[in-house]
Amino acid sequence: PLLASNGLLYGVSESSYENGSVLGSEKLFSYNPVTGVFNTLYDFNLSTGTVQSKLMQATNRKIYMTSADGGFYKRGSIMTYDLTTNALATIYVSRGYNNPDPGPNDFERAANNPLIQASNGKIYLASKFGGNGNLGVTSMLNPDGSSYQINDSFESLLVNQGTVPAGGLLQIGEFLYGTTLNGDDVNF
């Protein structure tokens, strides 16, 4: 869970199943550790997609999350939950890998890599899939969802570069660091 600036814990519950049938969808919830009260804030659906990412609160006090299969193309999206208005909004929809529509081969199915807000105010994402070879990308955008840009597209033909970013990004000083699932003896 995420401890937000308002003192509440926020999280996403998993879908519930019984005998192979879905009983309930994932839910965004809050928990007040003082009163012990749980509140369901949003029921995710087919248009929002499956949220498996960790939640992140940015300096604008909004909570950010990624979906694995939401948005128009069902390739993933970035969403925010506004603590002031209690509204969920999709701020970016991924086109995914090898999409026939013109545009970048951006992130795809960013299931559980967390977002990070860097010291420059931008939101960064490392996705296991997407990019030119569908081996992952790192990308950034403004907190309002504008100016999406791919920073790096991981490709297996490049020497000394891993593929399939996993675990998110970490900022130390001016640089962002991350890990990949595949690499060589230099990048492992």
Where are each of the predicted segments found?
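Extracellular beta-propeller repeat domains
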Residues: 1-188
